[in-house]
């Protein structure tokens, strides 16, 4: 499909001119290049109809032709507002709703806010739609608390929306009088309805407030969360940690299949919503805490808390080394990493694999067709050091013991390095093997000088070598 806004430097859909199948192939290849070294990358999950999927829209008010109030989006790398009548990515009901907002605001003679002069009233309009419920929210962002003729505006908006065939569920005003790129202000007042809408996702109902974090592509979110819960291999007996949980969508989706769910989120309003969503859905085995995820899991791990499965869905900058260190201390059997940035995901997988986790699969999901963004669900399991593996041994001599046929010195060194980061010498390996009763050929541990000052294998390295020997079934 063609879009007139592309010629005006919209920048919202950089891949719109590319065939959708080619988009998917390019995104899948990107993930393979970044994550393929960790484990298999599954085929990307795309959409059947990759248009009109955005259930949330933010428009900025400006002055159009003839001084008429209009609204739109910022041009790429600019502060210029491009008027938008409709968008190939936005929910079509929300396109109609925005036209109604503009008409009602014009009727009330509201003026757009001018950042340079500090004059005018209307800054932005945020719209949400519950895809499954059809409920619509209008959030009007103003530069001052007083909305002149607020009741008349509400009446006019409901009338104009009705002309468009849209039933508005709630209207909220939020005040943002600061010089900032942040859209919503701190003060809110409900002008109509209850101040929130409902939507259904993966069998649960969620209350969405103006500030709620909620994935903008409903269809693909169900795919994403379905993959995440499947990757957890839940049996109903597990304690699950949902880190960076937002309003609790992943944790509550998993709650039906787990013994207990604990959600952690730094945004207090999101936690408030998560608790309310749990109550609304009758979920009694989920608890939510307002805390920094890294700090919370660090304290929990130090206190000896354990989790069988950890979901992690961090922001674009990814997780932290401290968080991953605490994951290793909690030693969950499985980790499911939901990522919106494959670059930071690759960085974090490097740390997780060093901590004894194996990447079973990475599955990209096209949450944002026609953009360059990629979501990925990565399934990890804790390596079992007693797991039996097949080793292809290259025998350099025939005179070896039964134990020596299990693994070469090089393989033992590589195992220790990969799982602990430690470098161990053949001398240290020989010393530990001798302690374990494994017969050595004389040249490995025999000193070359008389009265030698023999180096003793440090305790930390001895433990690591013993783990390697156990892994290779040598002790």
Give the location of each predicted region.
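Short, charged amphipathic recognition helices of the HTH superfamily
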Residues: 401-414, 425-426, 440
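Extended interfacial segments that mediate partner engagement and assembly in macromolecular machines
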Residues: 11-112, 127, 132, 146-147
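DNA-recognition alpha helix
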Residues: 408-420, 430-436
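Phospho-regulated, low-complexity intrinsically disordered regions of nuclear gene-regulatory
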Residues: 454-475
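Short cysteine clusters
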Residues: 3-6, 10-13, 340
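Rossmann-like S-adenosyl-L-methionine
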Residues: 148-401, 409-410
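Short, aliphatic-rich beta-strand segments
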Residues: 127, 134-143, 205-209, 309
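Short Lys/Arg-enriched helix C-cap and helix-to-coil transition segments
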Residues: 440-450
């Amino acid at each position: 499909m063609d879009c007139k806004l592309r010629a005006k430097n919209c920048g919202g859909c950089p891949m719109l001119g590319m065939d959708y199948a080619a988009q998917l192939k390019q995104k899948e290849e990107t993930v393979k290049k970044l994550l393929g070294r960790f484990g298999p990358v599954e085929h990307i999950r795309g959409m059947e109809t990759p248009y009109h999927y955005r259930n949330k829209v933010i428009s900025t008010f400006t002055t159009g032709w003839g001084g008429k109030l209009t609204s739109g989006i910022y041009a790429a790398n600019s502060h210029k507002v491009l008027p938008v009548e409709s968008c190939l990515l936005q929910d079509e009901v929300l396109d109609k709703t925005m036209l109604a907002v503009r008409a009602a605001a014009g009727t009330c003679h509201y003026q757009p806010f001018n950042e340079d002069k500090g004059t005018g009233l209307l800054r932005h309009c945020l719209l949400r739609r519950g895809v499954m419920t059809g409920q619509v929210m209008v959030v009007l962002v103003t530069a001052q608390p007083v909305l002149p003729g607020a009741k008349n505006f509400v009446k006019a908006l409901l009338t104009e929306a009705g002309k468009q065939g849209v039933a508005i569920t709630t209207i909220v005003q939020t005040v943002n009088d600061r010089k900032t790129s942040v859209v919503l202000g701190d003060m809110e007042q409900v002008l109509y309805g209850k101040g929130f809408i409902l939507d259904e996702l993966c069998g649960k109902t969620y209350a969405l407030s103006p500030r709620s974090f909620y994935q903008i592509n409903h269809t693909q979110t169900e795919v994403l969360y379905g993959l995440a819960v499947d990757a957890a291999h839940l049996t109903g007996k597990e304690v699950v940690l949902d880190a960076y949980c937002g309003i609790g969508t992943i944790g509550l989706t998993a709650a039906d299949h787990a013994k207990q769910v604990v959600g952690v989120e730094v945004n207090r309003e999101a936690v408030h919503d998560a608790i309310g969503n749990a109550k609304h859905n009758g979920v009694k085995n989920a608890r939510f805490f307002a805390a920094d995820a890294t700090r919370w899991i660090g304290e929990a791990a130090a206190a000896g808390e354990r989790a069988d499965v950890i979901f992690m869905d961090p922001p674009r900058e990814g997780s932290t080394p401290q968080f991953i260190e605490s994951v290793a201390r909690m030693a969950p059997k499985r980790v499911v990493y939901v990522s919106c940035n494959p670059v930071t995901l690759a960085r974090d997988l490097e740390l997780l694999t060093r901590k004894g986790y194996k990447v079973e699969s990475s599955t990209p999901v096209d949450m944002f067709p026609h953009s360059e963004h990629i979501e990925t669900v990565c399934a990890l399991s804790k390596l079992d050091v007693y797991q039996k593996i097949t080793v292809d041994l290259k025998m350099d001599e025939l005179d070896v013991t039964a134990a020596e046929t299990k693994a070469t010195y090089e393989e033992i060194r590589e195992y220790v390095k990969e799982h602990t980061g430690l470098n161990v010498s053949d001398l240290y390996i020989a010393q530990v093997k001798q302690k374990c009763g494994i017969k050595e050929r004389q040249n490995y541990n025999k000193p070359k000088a008389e009265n030698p000052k023999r180096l003793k294998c440090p305790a930390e390295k001895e433990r690591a070598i013993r783990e390697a020997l156990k892994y290779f079934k040598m002790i």
